[in-house]
Design a protein with these regions (language model features):
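Short, disulfide-bonded extracellular cysteine-rich repeat modules
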Residues: 1-7, 26-35, 43-52, 71-80, ...
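Acidic, proline-/serine-/threonine-rich low-complexity intrinsically disordered repeat tracts
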Residues: 8-14, 52-59, 96-104
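Disulfide-braced loops of extracellular cysteine-rich modules
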Residues: 14-22, 34-43, 59-67, 79-88, ...
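Sequence context of c-type cytochrome heme-c attachment sites
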Residues: 140-282, 288-349, 353-367, 488-490, ...
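Divalent metal-coordination and catalytic microenvironments
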Residues: 176, 378, 486, 584
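Repeat-solenoid scaffold signature
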Residues: 348-472
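A structural signal for short secondary-structure junctions
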Residues: 369-370, 462, 476-481, 573-579, ...
């Protein structure tokens, strides 16, 4: 109002209610607010910011012991173990307890035993059941013979086991004495010139492997199902000399025949174990001899070697599916069915059609072919597919230890398989693998040389004109014949060109060729020739080829080429691997003219087709 006066200043803003002693009123905002001015963790006491009084932590009373801790998470502190489960507290540390070793048997238990610790003292108990035997360190199921008291042994020798077998099986013993397996001879209805005879067979034949059994029985009869056949005094009517175990003992029992002992078991054989393991023959039993025929693994037949012991379907469709040899070959009265073309003995026929029938194919054209072509011809496209076989054996070079490593030389087959190509005991060999068979007409009839047969004079001097030791007889004109596959074994061996005899050498034992082969330092061709002369004299005398008072001289014998045909029956391949049309027809490598055809019936006219 025209007068100078002091302005009216509003009172400062204040906090309502008033702030505490340790607070200030912050008026910077729209509304005053009290804020603490004590630092974090401090409390206000009597207008001063001070640290709070913290009560002491809770503790366990009494204090916890070693390996414990005080747990204060609950209402009241409590001591708890600080060791993990299973640990113990020792000297203030958590440690694993010392566990005493479990009780054990001392001495330790043997194979097929378990240590029983449930009693006061550990004791070893047999783990095998009543129908099991310990063989090869394993409990193996066996037949009912396992528990027979009569087979508890001990047995002094093989005949002692056989004697016990005959107590229950006298008829079986009698039957076996009549078999070709036992006599190595039997009916030969298909053997040219010997159709009505029953005393010919393996022991009267000559071959181009180890030649003949005469004078070599002690070695050869390692594969005879008997004991003690050392010479012509062996009693084929004595059933106690039958070796039941070689055909019936479980292979895992360890039973085997020793080399050069006329069929005696190996010294390590457990005859009691073998006797208690007997059962139906398996391929191990049959293969113990047949896989090693001719002096070695797969040497002879070419379709029977040790690879078939654990055959796959690719190796052999029958054995690869678990079949045993006896499934096809066993007959009544211990007879074995079948006839090898190189043996000529039969005690019953065996043919694929026995199981598969005469028209096994869905394709009529194939069934039509089967009228004239054996099943094996197409279904065994090659033999010795898994392991090599001998295809040629030249005895004329034997006796030279200056060759190779003390008379042994190694080589390889076409696929790189290592084989022995020379052995001073036996000469030079040719091995082959995955061999395409040779083919011929066959109706079961064969021609086969015995040790007393003569060969056509003049043959054998050249490999192209060999002495034929064995061959099928049929040809294209024989209505019942079929084209069959064969392994043709070729070789060179000693002959008497004057008597035209294929000579039997004594190879094994005293007076034989093998033990007298000179050392490398003493080798001369003349010394080996003289050794052969002595060996041939001894063998020919035993075989009846010369008189007991006759002897050969070095110039009275010579070497000749030979061949022997053997039928191929095993190693049946899967169907997809069977021969097809063009494997034979329109194939220049297939020799139709050798089979009696004028030409290939598929591509020519008037060739001589039979179907």
């Amino acid at each position: 109002n025209g007068t100078c006066v002091a302005p009216v200043v509003p009172p400062p803003a204040t906090c309502e209610p008033a702030c505490d002693a340790c607070q200030t009123c912050d008026t910077r905002g729209e509304t005053p607010v009290c804020v603490d001015h004590c630092a974090p963790g401090l409390v206000c006491e009597r207008g001063t910011c001070v640290a709070p009084i913290v009560p002491p932590p809770a503790t366990c009373e009494p204090a916890c012991g070693d390996c414990q801790r005080c747990d204060t998470t609950g209402e009241s502190p409590v001591c708890v173990n600080n060791c993990a489960d299973g640990l113990l507290c020792e000297a203030g540390r958590c440690v694993a307890p010392v566990v005493p070793p479990p009780p054990t048997c001392d001495p330790a238990c043997g194979p097929c035993q378990v240590c029983d610790t449930t009693g006061a003292a550990p004791v070893c108990l047999d783990a095998c059941g009543d129908d099991e035997l310990c063989m090869g360190g394993l409990c193996r199921p066996v037949g009912m013979h396992a528990g027979f008291d009569a087979l508890a042994g001990p047995f002094a020798d093989g005949p002692a086991v056989t004697t016990q077998c005959l107590e229950c099986h006298p008829n079986e013993g009698h039957d076996f004495l009549q078999t070709a397996h036992w006599r190595w001879a039997g009916p030969t209805p298909n053997l040219e010139g010997h159709e009505g005879e029953t005393n010919l067979g393996k022991r009267t034949l000559i071959n181009n492997f180890c030649i003949a059994t005469d004078s070599n029985e002690t070695r050869c009869t390692q594969c005879h199902a008997g004991y003690g056949w050392r010479d012509d005094t062996f009693n084929f009517e004595d059933p106690t000399k039958i070796d039941c175990l070689v055909c019936h003992a479980d292979g895992a029992s360890g039973y085997a025949k020793a080399t050069g002992t006329a069929g005696a078991p190996v010294p390590a054989a457990d005859l009691t174990l073998a006797a208690r393991s007997v059962g139906r023959p398996t391929r191990d039993n049959c293969g113990a001899c047949h896989f090693y025929a001719g002096g070695g693994d797969n040497v002879k037949k070419g379709d029977l070697g040790s690879a078939l012991k654990n055959a796959t379907v690719e190796m052999d469709v029958h054995l690869g599916r678990g079949m045993e040899c006896a499934d096809c070959h066993a007959a009544d009265n211990h007879r074995v069915l079948g006839q090898g073309a190189h043996i000529g003995v039969t005690q019953g026929s065996l043919d694929c059609s026995n199981c598969h029938g005469g028209s096994p194919h869905a394709n009529g054209l194939l069934n039509n072919h089967a009228l004239d072509v054996a099943c094996q011809t197409c279904h065994v496209p090659a033999f010795s597919r898994q392991q090599p076989t001998k295809m040629n054996w030249d005895w004329s070079t034997a006796g030279n230890r200056t060759r190779g490593n003390n008379g042994v030389e190694q080589g390889t087959t076409a696929d790189g398989t290592t084989v022995t190509v020379y052995d001073a005991m036996k000469g030079d060999f040719v091995w082959e693998k995955n061999v395409r068979p040779e083919y011929a007409w066959y109706d079961g009839r064969v021609r086969r040389m015995m040790t007393d047969d003569t060969y056509p004079a003049g043959t054998g001097a050249d490999a192209g004109d060999p002495i034929v030791l064995g061959t099928p007889l049929a040809d294209h004109a024989d209505a019942d014949a079929k084209i069959w596959p064969f392994k043709v074994m070729r070789g060179r061996q000693a002959v008497d060109p004057v008597r035209t005899l294929v000579l039997v050498p004594k190879l094994f034992g005293p007076g034989g060729f093998w033990p007298a082969i000179p050392a490398a330092a003493a080798y001369t061709p003349e010394a080996v020739r003289a050794l052969w002369t002595s060996s041939l004299t001894a063998g020919a005398r035993t075989a009846g080829q010369i008189r007991a008072d006759e002897s050969y001289t070095d110039d009275a014998w010579t070497w000749a080429y030979t061949e022997m045909w053997m039928g191929i029956e095993h190693e049946v391949a899967p169907p997809a691997e069977a021969l097809g049309c063009q494997d034979c027809h329109a194939n220049p490598a297939f020799d139709f003219t050798a089979l009696g055809y004028a030409c290939d019936p598929l591509v020519g006219n008037n060739c001589g087709s039979r179907h």
